[in-house]
Amino acid sequence: MNRAAIYPGSFDPLTNGHLAIIQRGLNLFDRLVVAVANNPQKSPMFTVDERKALIREAVGNDPRVEVDSFDGLMVDYARTRGIPKVLRGLRAVSDFEYEFQLANMNKKLLPEFESVFVMTGEDYFFVSARLVREVAVFGGNVEGLVPPNVLEALQRKLGRPPRT
């Protein structure tokens, strides 16, 4: 059986929480498409291509993980790819409220669409890409919250020498 799901997000930047969701997703599905959303209404720190490259490097050569990007509605991307399942990570009850609304809207737009929710690891309940960006911009240490390659990319992007 070839069970696949899409794990969409902005991943700006990829965090260890995202990696935990990818790992949990691989326990549920044969294949994951990590799909980087290109949202023109946001001003990302990293370009779509940079985010895709950082994700590829962080997941290594796992043949079960494909990294892609999309514009527009995720359900349209899911329809185009023929993958009507989405994997979403939850950290808190507040995440569920938003994700529940989104899942129902997606189901309305694409009736065969299914959302699968998994909890992130307890070490990452508080971690969000937005928070990581904010802490990094103000000079805080985000080591342990992001993969090593992302930490290096953040340091380069912000013009800071790597910590030793």
From Swiss-Prot:
It comes from the Bacteria. InterPro entries: Cyt_trans-like, PPAT, Rossmann-like_a/b/a_fold. The record marks H18 as: Transition state stabilizer. It is found in: Cytoplasm. It catalyses: (R)-4'-phosphopantetheine + ATP + H(+) = 3'-dephospho-CoA + diphosphate. It holds the Pfam family CTP_transf_like. GO terms for biological process: coenzyme A biosynthetic process. Pathway: Cofactor biosynthesis; coenzyme A biosynthesis; CoA from (R)-pantothenate: step 4/5. Substrate binds at S10, K42, M74, R88. Its EC number is 2.7.7.3. It is an enzyme of class 2 (transferase). Reversibly transfers an adenylyl group from ATP to 4'-phosphopantetheine, yielding dephospho-CoA (dPCoA) and pyrophosphate. PANTHER family: PHOSPHOPANTETHEINE ADENYLYLTRANSFERASE. Homohexamer. Belongs to the bacterial CoaD family. This is Phosphopantetheine adenylyltransferase. It comes from Anaeromyxobacter dehalogenans (strain 2CP-C).
